[in-house]
UniProtKB/Swiss-Prot annotation:
The active site is at residue 56. One of its GO terms (molecular function) is identical protein binding. The gene is get3. One of its GO terms (biological process) is tail-anchored membrane protein insertion into ER membrane. It is found in: Cytoplasm; Endoplasmic reticulum; Nucleus. This is ATPase get3.
């Protein structure tokens, strides 16, 4: 049974006032960062405070806005209520380990305990994720938008709360089994092993992570915006991503299709061939995802860099693009 297609804009996200977490992701090179920056600009018009955070080690936010961002949130120039930050999960866990070493520089068991903890698959990235959430929570933003790493990393990132909850359970078991032995070894060697420092810190994250896990699975609070281009590989990757998001119980009902050639009157042979291919895959996207908001964004003539260019691009996410019927752009 067919029904009228949903509006091809992201206006629905602006209207959903309960949203707290918005993830933007897709294959590399499809305009993911441009889309997340533009969405953040539009959200800042309707929310009191918005944080745009990059978890992609490539860190394109700085390039997009032409302003250097780092691991601490700072205001985006030209906005009073939009901040941005760039975090490398791998660096975060490295810093956490260094801090532990600085606190116990003479403890020979400190490294052993960390090695023991980090043998659990995914625990390093999961702990880094917990550190990110801790920072965000202390800042009290009304809405947080994640510019995520390319697809595979994104899906792993979204599964971190579950990984961490399981890991903490395992660590709790390790603590009860090996804690007395470690303390005994410490007393023999004349040092304070204090394994509770490490296990205690991880255990204290459990309630926090458990709450976030629930929020991520609540469609009133969390959604994922898929970004793609109208080509076979991108369509395939988007389908795989949506299936995995569904298995993680994470809501997704918006797809942004970038770089479309929409001029029906072009006489350029290469453009005509590419447009024909794009129209074929666009028809498949619309058929597969008839219950999604499919946002069609045209190929723009220049790179979208700088605040003004992003503001202009962002309008195409909230108003359906109509190709001019006469004259040239």
């Amino acid at each position: 049974m067919s029904f009228d297609p949903l509006p091809g804009t992201l206006e629905n996200l602006l209207e959903q006032t309960s949203l707290k977490w918005i993830f933007v992701g897709g294959k590399g090179g499809v305009g993911k960062t441009t889309t997340s920056c533009s969405l953040a600009i539009q959200m800042s018009k309707v929310r009191s405070s918005v944080l745009l955070i990059s978890t992609d080690p490539a860190h394109n936010l700085s390039d997009a806005f032409g302003t250097k961002f780092g691991k601490d949130a700072r205001k985006v120039p030209g906005f009073d209520n939009l901040s941005a930050m760039e975090i490398d999960p791998n660096l975060s866990i490295q810093e956490m380990t260094e801090q532990a070493d600085q606190q116990n520089p003479n403890n020979p068991l400190s490294g052993m305990m960390q090695d023991l903890a980090f043998t659990i698959p995914g625990i390093d990235e999961a702990l880094a994720f917990a550190e990110i959430l801790k920072q965000i929570k202390s800042m009290e933003f009304d809405c947080v938008i994640f510019d995520t790493a390319p697809t595979g990393h994104t899906l792993r990132f979204l599964n971190f709360p579950t990984v961490l909850e399981k890991a903490l359970g395992k660590l709790g078991g390790l603590s009860s089994r090996f804690g007395p032995m470690i303390n005994q070894m410490g007393s023999i060697m004349g040092v304070n092993a204090n394994e509770q420092d490490l296990f205690g810190k991880m255990e204290s994250m459990r309630a926090n992570i458990s709450e976030v896990n629930k929020q991520f699975k609540n469609p009133d609070l969390t959604t994922f915006v898929c970004v793609c281009i109208s080509e076979f590989l991108s369509l395939y990757e988007t389908e795989r991503m949506i299936q995995e998001l569904t298995s993680y119980e994470i809501d997704t009902h918006n797809i942004v299709v970038n770089q479309l050639l929409l001029d029906p009157n072009t006489t350029c042979p290469q453009c005509m061939a590419r447009r024909k291919m794009q129209q074929k895959y666009l028809a498949q996207i619309e058929e597969l995802y008839e219950d999604f908001h499919v946002v069609k964004v045209p190929q723009v003539p220049a790179e979208v860099r700088g605040t003004e260019a992003l503001k202009s691009f962002s309008e195409m996410l909230v108003k359906p693009y109509v190709y001019p019927t006469s004259g040239k752009e």
